[in-house]
């Protein structure tokens, strides 16, 4: 009986630990997402790129990122009205109101740097 109680208590403690880690990861993602949104609103491409992880940076140079941000992304929308939609598979989704309506997707890598930073047309 003592072994069963010990096993149950151990499982509960481990489960609580995983829960707290998941909450901490979500809190970090939410915090960095707020910073990303701030930099979008301020049109600070260099600051956005500084938040990027190694994989992200290996796909896009800083100069190319700045060019895309300044010539395509920033003129597209003012990013002033952004609403959280959901989190799925550690990716936060946001609706960006305006013309056109956009969807913003943000995720982090293992070092809490941007892994996914995607802006696409919003579809219901």
Give, region by region, the residue ranges found by the protein language model.
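Generic structural motif
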Residues: 4, 15, 99, 109-111, ...
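Surface-exposed, charged secondary-structure patches
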Residues: 68-111, 116
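Short, low-complexity N-terminal intrinsically disordered segments enriched in polar/charged residues
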Residues: 16-38
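Short, solvent-exposed aromatic-acidic interface loops
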Residues: 118-124
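Short solvent-exposed beta->alpha transition segments
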Residues: 40, 45-86
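Bacterial Sec-dependent N-terminal signal peptides
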Residues: 1-22
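Short charge-dense sequence patches
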Residues: 17-23, 55-57, 102-104, 117
């Amino acid at each position: 009986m003592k072994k069963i109680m010990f096993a149950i208590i151990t499982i509960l403690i481990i489960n609580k630990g995983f829960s707290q880690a998941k909450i901490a990861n979500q809190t970090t993602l939410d915090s960095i997402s707020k910073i990303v949104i701030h930099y979008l609103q301020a049109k600070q491409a260099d600051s956005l790129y500084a938040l990027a992880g190694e994989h992200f940076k290996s796909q896009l140079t800083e100069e190319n990122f700045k060019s895309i941000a300044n010539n395509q992304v920033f003129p597209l929308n003012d990013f002033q009205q952004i609403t959280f939609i959901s989190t799925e598979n550690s990716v936060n989704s946001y609706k960006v109101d305006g013309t056109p309506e956009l969807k913003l997707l943000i995720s982090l890598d293992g070092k809490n740097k941007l892994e996914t930073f995607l802006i696409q047309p919003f579809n219901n």
